[in-house]
């Protein structure tokens, strides 16, 4: 896929893949290709989640530093 999908679009695609594989009516090669695509999507989703988690942690830490500095001013 050349175009970058949103997180939600990739989640929907992963759900489609899982549902299709669970039906069990595909040929072995088709199942393997879908499984491979699902693993690739899963890795991208995990990477995106990790990046967002890092940003959230950074924001929380920055906010704590600001709060701490404001408390020092009050003393």
UniProtKB/Swiss-Prot annotation:
SUPFAM superfamilies: XseB-like. One of its GO terms (molecular function) is exodeoxyribonuclease VII activity. Pfam families: Exonuc_VII_S. It catalyses: Exonucleolytic cleavage in either 5'- to 3'- or 3'- to 5'-direction to yield nucleoside 5'-phosphates. GO terms for cellular component: cytosol; exodeoxyribonuclease VII complex. GO terms for biological process: DNA catabolic process. The keyword Hydrolase applies. Keywords: Cytoplasm, Exonuclease, Hydrolase, Nuclease. Its EC number is 3.1.11.6. Its main location: cytoplasm. It is found in: Cytoplasm. Heterooligomer composed of large and small subunits. HAMAP family: Exonuc_7_S. Belongs to the XseB family. Bidirectionally degrades single-stranded DNA into large acid-insoluble oligonucleotides, which are then degraded further into small acid-soluble oligonucleotides. This is Exodeoxyribonuclease 7 small subunit. It comes from Thermoanaerobacter sp. (strain X514).
């Amino acid at each position: 896929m050349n175009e970058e999908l949103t997180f939600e679009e990739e989640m929907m695609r992963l759900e489609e893949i899982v549902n299709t594989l669970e039906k069990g009516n595909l040929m072995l090669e088709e199942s393997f290709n879908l499984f491979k695509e699902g693993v690739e999507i899963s890795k991208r989703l995990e990477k995106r989640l990790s990046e967002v988690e890092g940003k959230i942690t950074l924001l929380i830490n920055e906010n704590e530093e600001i709060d701490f500095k404001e408390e020092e001013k009050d003393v």
